[in-house]
């Protein structure tokens, strides 16, 4: 399956950050046509490719979360893993695309769906115009090679804004920088680790040292756990940093502080970021909320949050509770990009995949994931049997993202076996 790895390395040469996927769209469309597929592209940029009389559709998304120096992605191999130098790797979901490309070169009866802008609220699949010919859909966006996903979390974006003015003051100005945070990972898959949030740690540091905020921003993406944060703050007394917050004296002089200082700090410090409910039966997070980003610009304090739940009632509840929390502090709040969870069950496709997967991973099992999968939305648009698999990808959505090469080989074999059995 070396061609899968080569396919992936070639994909990494093409910029495909979310919202900036035009070059990748053109590449995949041309590739499919060259392999004899009939291709159509809808308004959202979703690419549908079909050849012969297929029974199964393979599906992956072609945008990536760009962190660090991405879209420049310099791939290298180290200790059996694919990594990227100073950037996210894009194995989520580039490896899935690479496997589909290999299958397109091999099979005469195949249907493929490449979806756009999955990483920004599953935008592409939510606007999907294509109707699939196949009755089974195999999604290749999972990140653990001993599991078959038949359920996933739904999600909703939440924004909270508060106007502020400034007050003139004079004194000592300190620059704060978050440091040593392991965050930046996927806010669904990695939220169970209970890693510290850079935004919350900085707010606590400022509050405990009686600081007055001049500026404060933190976080990277709505679906990444906050890793970075920085602030300019006035402290009356000399302040020293700690293991999480680097504190540097800048100067003494005049400045303007935020008149909503206490409300801003109280909002962050009182908010319960992270896991809210856990499913003991499936051993996965059931409901969570990610306090993702904070910005202060144009006299506006703006938070973005991402709520997830694997049950419909749980998602509606966390959305309601979060909005009421911010309203109580006087914020203007809105929610958008709501998509329901996929509360699936084992089916004929998952049974076929499990049989093939057990040959390479004897402990393979059927489960659900605390993250969004597009097949959950597609199966609500038309009647389909769905399942999701993928190779081991560690720390997606971060500069530490890495993908296990032998795991890619395993999943590639499984995909090819399932396709051959349904040729």
Describe the residue ranges of each PLM region.
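Alpha-helical metal-binding/catalytic segments enriched in His/Glu/Asp
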Residues: 58, 78-121, 172-180, 185-209, ...
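N-terminal capping segment at the start of a domain
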Residues: 1-19, 184, 335
């Amino acid at each position: 399956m070396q061609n899968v790895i080569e396919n992936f390395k070639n994909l990494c040469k093409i910029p495909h950050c979310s919202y900036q996927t035009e070059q990748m769209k053109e590449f995949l469309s041309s590739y499919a046509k060259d392999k004899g597929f009939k291709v159509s592209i809808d308004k959202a940029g979703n690419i549908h490719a079909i050849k012969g009389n297929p029974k199964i559709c393979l599906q992956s998304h072609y945008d990536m979360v760009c962190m660090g120096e991405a879209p420049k992605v310099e791939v290298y191999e180290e200790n059996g893993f694919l990594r990227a130098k100073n950037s996210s790797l894009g194995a989520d979901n580039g490896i899935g695309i690479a496997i589909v490309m290999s299958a397109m070169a091999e099979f005469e009866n195949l249907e493929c769906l490449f979806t756009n802008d999955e990483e920004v609220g599953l935008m592409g699949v939510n606007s999907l115009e294509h109707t699939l010919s196949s009755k089974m859909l195999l999604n290749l966006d999972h990140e653990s090679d001993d599991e078959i996903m038949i359920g996933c979390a739904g999600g909703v974006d939440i924004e909270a804004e508060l106007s502020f003015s400034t007050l003139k003051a004079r004194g000592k100005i300190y620059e704060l920088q978050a440091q040593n945070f392991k965050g930046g990972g996927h806010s669904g898959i990695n939220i169970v680790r209970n890693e510290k949030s850079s935004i919350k740690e900085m707010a606590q540091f400022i509050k405990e040292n009686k600081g007055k905020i001049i500026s404060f921003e933190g976080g990277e993406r709505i679906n990444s756990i906050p890793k970075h944060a920085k602030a300019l703050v006035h402290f009356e007394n000399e302040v020293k940093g700690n293991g999480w917050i680097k504190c540097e004296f800048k100067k003494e002089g005049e400045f303007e502080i935020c008149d909503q200082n206490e409300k801003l700090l109280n909002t962050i410090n009182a908010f319960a970021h992270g896991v809210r409910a856990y499913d003991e039966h499936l051993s996965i997070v059931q409901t969570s909320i990610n306090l993702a980003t904070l910005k202060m610009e144009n006299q506006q304090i703006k938070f973005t949050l991402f709520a997830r739940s694997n049950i419909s009632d749980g998602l509606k509840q966390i959305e309601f509770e979060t909005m009421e929390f911010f309203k109580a502090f006087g914020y203007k709040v809105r929610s958008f990009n709501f998509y329901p969870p996929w509360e699936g069950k084992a089916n004929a496709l998952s049974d076929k995949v499990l049989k093939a997967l057990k040959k390479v991973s004897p402990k393979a099992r059927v489960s659900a994931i605390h993250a969004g999968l597009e097949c959950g939305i597609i199966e609500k648009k038309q009647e389909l049997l769905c399942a999701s698999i993928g190779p081991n990808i560690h720390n997606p959505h971060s500069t530490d993202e890495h993908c296990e090469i032998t795991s890619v080989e395993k999943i590639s074999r499984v995909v090819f076996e399932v396709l051959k059995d349904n040729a």
